[in-house]
Amino acid sequence: MSFSRALLWARLPAGRQAGHRAAICSALRPHFGPFPGVLGQVSVLATASSSASGGSKIPNTSLFVPLTVKPQGPSADGDVGAELTRPLDKNEVKKVLDKFYKRKEIQKLGADYGLDARLFHQAFISFRNYIMQSHSLDVDIHIVLNDICFGAAHADDLFPFFLRHAKQIFPVLDCKDDLRKISDLRIPPNWYPDARAMQRKIIFHSGPTNSGKTYHAIQKYFSAKSGVYCGPLKLLAHEIFEKSNAAGVPCDLVTGEERVTVQPNGKQASHVSCTVEMCSVTTPYEVAVIDEIQMIRDPARGWAWTRALLGLCAEEVHLCGEPAAIDLVMELMYTTGEEVEVRDYKRLTPISVLDHALESLDNLRPGDCIVCFSKNDIYSVSRQIEIRGLESAVIYGSLPPGTKLAQAKKFNDPNDPCKILVATDAIGMGLNLSIRRIIFYSLIKPSINEKGERELEPITTSQALQIAGRAGRFSSRFKEGEVTTMNHEDLSLLKEILKRPVDPIRAAGLHPTAEQIEMFAYHLPDATLSNLIDIFVDFSQVDGQYFVCNMDDFKFSAELIQHIPLSLRVRYVFCTAPINKKQPFVCSSLLQFARQYSRNEPLTFAWLRRYIKWPLLPPKNIKDLMDLEAVHDVLDLYLWLSYRFMDMFPDASLIRDLQKELDGIIQDGVHNITKLIKMSETHKLLNLEGFPSGSQSRLSGTLKSQARRTRGTKALGSKATEPPSPDAGELSLASRLVQQGLLTPDMLKQLEKEWMTQQTEHNKEKTESGTHPKGTRRKKKEPDSD
């Protein structure tokens, strides 16, 4: 039937018109495409629904962000649907749509197509708005709505149109099976065909710290024709790089921020020392060494060890680490058809847990290392040591590598008056330190769980062994190591922790690749990168030997730069840049770098100098020192990006020289850290008054087990506190929280404002009701209850 003939059919009276609707749809199909809304379609859809649902894993539909479908404006051809039938009565249409929404059969049918209650509701709201707000509708849906209004069709006939609209706003509904295939992570060994094409020999060097396990693996590395060392830290990669070249084995260095080739012609050496994330899984080697293999369980970085273990193309792969990783490694290698040879090592020097705690900083001896788990504890301990006329070195995680090495050298030098080290668990690996006695200032380490909540937990056995093992190392002048705690009540818990067996590692980390995310983006082109990651993790399938690593830092960066126009691959690279999201200046720098990149404006040396306001002054207080550390991290970020986008970050060598100069400024600041602490106290930038020579709040007695998983300020409710000293009479709970690093002064001010507001509201309620607020009554009763 021709188009003009179809129009003639549309002039028929309403009754005859409805009777011939199927014929009209058939006539118009060549002109307007298929009509999904013919009568009887619902039953057909119901029959096909079982195949449409696909897959057995129920997705988390809260991750599906609906797209916006704009209502249709006036058409240049006019309202063809109205010409074929008649204009629609919006009130009648609304009644039809409401009836459609309430139909249980329709809701059930929607569920068969992946529309749970939440998606169904969102899709209907969008569908209704589209229908009601459009100036003209497509011919097919206009005709169906007209017939329903006149009783010639059923409301169920709207379902095909509704489903089509739902797939427009939720495109994931149309490609769930494809997304499941892309995110199928159940056979990671198949991702590395080059490694699978060779028969590798896996040798596991198992033992505690200071057992010589890494030494034996490195000797094999030195004697090989070619090799790669994969370490967890830049410091370790640098150490092997220097040792290898000193031994006459030419070795290159590859880290995220640095590339060093030793051959005069720039040719790659046969050996390379790198951080584990930077190892090549396509270059063939004779020997590969993967250090600290137990970090394969790390929630954030475990994927890098998994990738190295499964993907390195080496005839021999030497693994160094804790015995807890042996079973998992053997299981993983069973899936690749490779056998594992285990070589056990014993500690080379004895280590003992003392029966007495330090109790007071007056009892410090040369070679002592006090391990703290917060910067505020480091500052306070350093200040107390300085008051006693002693000199201490300071090492914590956010210090630049050069500063850490300088402080380690100062502490190790027998001719230097510095005989005490105050450090965080950053000393657990990567530094050679001559420590006689490890003193745990606290056994409670703040951490962030998978929900982003702050937790206070005792350190694990693995962490305790790693830190305690730094005492009395074979290569140091102290051949016997000792371990104790600052407070006596912590000593029994430390002994208990050290005696516990280390839990075997159950699973290895995985991470989506850029290629997998790109394939996701192909199917979901309008989704944000953060949303793509959420959907990928939700759809991903892993077996019991693997887990998907925590992607929170990646998502944080993705959301930070979401509004910057970048290609997906470039955006992905920016999001993998290692930044400390607790540093506002570093985060804003990532944003600024991305913005400059999007404008195609190279980030030159001159531009960066202006951005960081170079030259920088030496620090006058702790805040200045922390600001300099943040600037150092920004320069690290520039160097990291310079190896990914050389044309846009062209001045890496100049920036590296600038960073070395900054490192020197920071070293001088840390060398005089007690002076900075004094200045901070003077200007009330750091409140350490009344701080006793022990920890402020400790787990003790039976409360220890109860407080192993506490959150926020609730942790203090499960702790027993020491009686305050006479000098600390004014020491409040808020002060203790600040000193322990659980609150910043700014956070405390905000809380004080909120408390004042709440108190004002309570007083107002009291005045209006004539009754005492509950909080006020309790406060009055407290003295009587003691």
Swiss-Prot record:
The main location is: nucleus
Could you tell me which residue ranges the Helicase ATP-binding domain spans? Answer: 194-334
Entries under Gene3D superfamilies matching the protein:
1.10.1740.140, 1.20.272.40, 1.20.58.1080, P-loop containing nucleotide triphosphate hydrolases
Thermal profile of function: Optimum temperature is 30 degrees Celsius.
Ranges for the Helicase C-terminal domain? 353-518
Going by the UniProt record, its keywords in alphabetical order are: Acetylation, ATP-binding, Helicase, Hydrolase, Mitochondrion, Mitochondrion nucleoid, Nucleotide-binding, Nucleus, Phosphoprotein, Transit peptide
What does the entry list as the binding residues for ATP?
A: 207-214
Q: How does changing the pH alter activity?
A: Optimum pH is 5.0.
Q: What is its EC number?
A: 3.6.4.13
Give the Gene Ontology MF terms in alphabetical order: 3'-5' RNA helicase activity; ATP binding; ATP hydrolysis activity; DNA binding; DNA helicase activity; double-stranded RNA binding; helicase activity; identical protein binding
Query: Bias category Basic and acidic residues: which stretches?
Result: 749-771
Modified residues annotated as N6-acetyllysine in this record: 99, 220
The region called Interaction with LAMTOR5, important for protein stability is annotated at: 650-786
Listed Polar residues bias regions: 693-705
Q: What does its activity-regulation comment describe?
A: Helicase activity toward DNA substrate is inhibited by micromolar concentrations of 5,6-dichloro-1-(beta-D-ribofuranosyl)benzotriazole (DRBT) and 4,5,6,7-tetrabromobenzotriazole (TBBT). Helicase activity toward RNA substrate is inhibited by elevated concentrations of TBBT. Inhibited by some ring-expanded nucleoside analogs.
**GO BP, one example?**
positive regulation of cell growth
**GO annotation, cellular component aspect:** mitochondrial degradosome; mitochondrial matrix; mitochondrial nucleoid; mitochondrion; nucleus
Q: Mind telling me which InterPro entries this protein's record contains? A: DEXQc_SUV3, Helicase_C-like, P-loop_NTPase, RNA-DNA_Helicase, SUV3_C, Suv3_C_1, Suv3_DEXQc, Suv3_N
Q: PANTHER family per the record?
A: ATP-DEPENDENT RNA AND DNA HELICASE (PTHR12131), ATP-DEPENDENT RNA HELICASE SUPV3L1, MITOCHONDRIAL-RELATED (PTHR12131:SF1)
Q: How does this chain assemble?
A: Homodimer; in free form. Component of the mitochondrial degradosome (mtEXO) complex which is a heteropentamer containing 2 copies of SUPV3L1 and 3 copies of PNPT1. As part of mitochondrial degradosome complex, interacts with GRSF1 in a RNA-dependent manner; the interaction enhances the activity of the complex. Interacts with LAMTOR5/HBXIP, WRN and BLM.
Q: Which family does it belong to?
A: Belongs to the helicase family.
Its name, as the record gives it, is: ATP-dependent RNA helicase SUPV3L1, mitochondrial
Q: Which organism is it from?
A: Homo sapiens (Human)
Top-down, what is the taxonomic lineage of the species of origin?
Eukaryota, Metazoa, Chordata, Craniata, Vertebrata
